[in-house]
Amino acid sequence: MKEELTILRKFEHIEHCLKRNVEAHVSNGFEDVYFVHKSLPEIDKDEIDLTVEFLGRKFDYPIMITGMTGGTRREEIAGKINRTLAMAAEELNIPFGVGSQRAMIEKPETWESYYVRDVAPDIFLIGNLGAPQFGKNAKKRYSVKEVLYAIEKIEADAIAIHMNPLQESVQPEGDTTYAGVLEALAEIKSSINYPVIAKETGAGVSKEVAIELESVGIDAIDISGLGGTSWSAVEYYRAKDSEKRKIALKFWDWGIKTAISLAEVRWATNLPIIASGGMRDGVMMAKALAMGASLVGIALPVLRPAARGDVEGVVRIIRGYAEEIKNVMFLVGARNIRELRRVPLVITGFVREWLLQRIDLNSYLRSRFKH
């Protein structure tokens, strides 16, 4: 019964993301970040190079498709979405992450909805498991065994452990067993030979948490900040009674804005960062890269074409973002992503106010080029 509920929940999550407005009511903060226009770029636009390296692999664009779904039969919607996105990622040579594989652990016959190697043999594929399942008080506590199963069954190159305390706290059947997760992450990292990515799910990562994650050997952080898909909003639509809806509504806009989280994590650690959370155009993405992100992550913008099986629609959206990034780079005189991280930035408004209280802003602006 529990396993069936997990699968039903995954289906409901997809349905609400496709049919409802599940985005935060507040911005992700990048409107407070400005480039300084360069009237003499002293470069040719055609020479701009968008390639990046991440976890030992070279990619054609600084964009990845982050985990969204899985957990039904291959021919059903979750499998269709994953296969469509994987084929697009293969064509573009960018990383792709599947959604939570908990359903696959609990109901192994759903594994095919996550398997994409037959259509995307060369992509950098990232598996996905939830942090609360590694808590010391979890009912069915996961171990290194489940991590290796999640990776090897779908032939992934890395594993993301998603941190979603906000979603779990407002979910009627939520798992809030987070005690002991950091220790479990340390054990995972010391026991497997695959990169481990710590991934938020729309509420952002603080500098304190980032430092803890770096201390246990995590290889990269997907900050997934406030300003994009709100999983509290998704749970608001799933809730069956008014009290649970009231709680989910109250926390709809909880979290750390993406731009703020990015600056905090870049200032506090040396880890590669995936900047996701409301990334909806190439100008915003260029700002994130200039602020120190290694990659920009997207999910919701490509969900609808993926649900239709429209590979070229997904490719077209991402190439459009890439062209916008390239245009920004031309206008600030950056030949490549490394040079983009060294161009002047002006940070204003709420983002500046927050960062002045939380980090050494001038030091951060001088050290954005760590990766």
UniProtKB/Swiss-Prot annotation:
EC top class named in words: isomerase
Enzyme Commission no: 5.3.3.2
Gene3D superfamilies: Aldolase class I
Protein name: Isopentenyl-diphosphate delta-isomerase
Function, as annotated: Involved in the biosynthesis of isoprenoids. Catalyzes the 1,3-allylic rearrangement of the homoallylic substrate isopentenyl (IPP) to its allylic isomer, dimethylallyl diphosphate (DMAPP).
Keyword set, alphabetical order: Cytoplasm, Flavoprotein, FMN, Isomerase, Isoprene biosynthesis, Magnesium, Metal-binding, NADP
Cofactor dependency: FMN; NADPH; Mg(2+)
NCBIfam families the record matches: IPP_isom_2
Coiled-coil ranges per UniProt: none
Family the entry assigns: Belongs to the IPP isomerase type 2 family.
GO cellular component: cytoplasm
Keyword Cytoplasm: yes
Subcellular locations according to the entry: Cytoplasm
Pfam family, one: FMN_dh
Keyword Hydrolase recorded: no
Assembly, per entry: Homooctamer. Dimer of tetramers.
GO BP annotations listed: isoprenoid biosynthetic process
Binding site for FMN: 66-69, 100, 128, 199, 224, 229, 278-280, 299-300
One Gene Ontology molecular-function label: FMN binding
Catalysed reactions, as listed in the record: isopentenyl diphosphate = dimethylallyl diphosphate
SMART domains (UniProt xref): IMPDH
Binding site for Mg(2+): 168
Binding site for substrate: 9-10, 100-102, 167
Cited InterPro entries: Aldolase_TIM, FMN-dep_DH, IPdP_isomerase
Origin superkingdom: Archaea
